[in-house]
């Protein structure tokens, strides 16, 4: 995550050097970079703001460019923040944005119309992606493929029940979903290899995968949803859980450690030697599988 945030700001600084001749005023002021992210207490996405603050301090200390962080708790607030930047009418500015969700597209289009260059980070909105100076994101399909490859290696068979805890409705979740299923059907490789022919899943097999819907990258939302899932004891038979982020995985682990699940159901579930994966490098996770 930290490496990706650094790359994001490097892209923004490169962008600043590209646009300075267009937007610089007579005094030759340095390009000012606005960095828009979720707040630091906003699940895994909060780490983006934390690392961005560190890099912004370095940028400001160097003196070639200036930068500031603006956090937004939700999409509506982020849209207002973008509109405020545009309304200020400043010269020689650039924007780095981690869109809260796809509804921010209209505000990003306003940046384009105002000829303010921007870098999109992490959540790429297809409708405006071509207008960005750069789209910086992780290998989200690769994350899904990695989980599918690991589970296949651990014995998951075509048609086994799988439960996927999704982050939100953005391109990040779509790609992590697709990476998982495309590996299973043989359309996508992982680590230079494709799934063995005798282990491939058919379209009918994929129907055994259940999707949670948007958990908003929230540990508490996932904990509540998981307790509800295991409120039906028959779901204790599900062995394979793909959480699309470590915060979601932690919600499941906290549910298993808490008192919201019937003890008999919990014992049945853990007796199945279930698997759980996440991603993001959260220190609390320790390892990708959940087995007892």
Model-derived segments and spans:
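Gram-positive cell-envelope targeting signals
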Residues: 1-26, 52
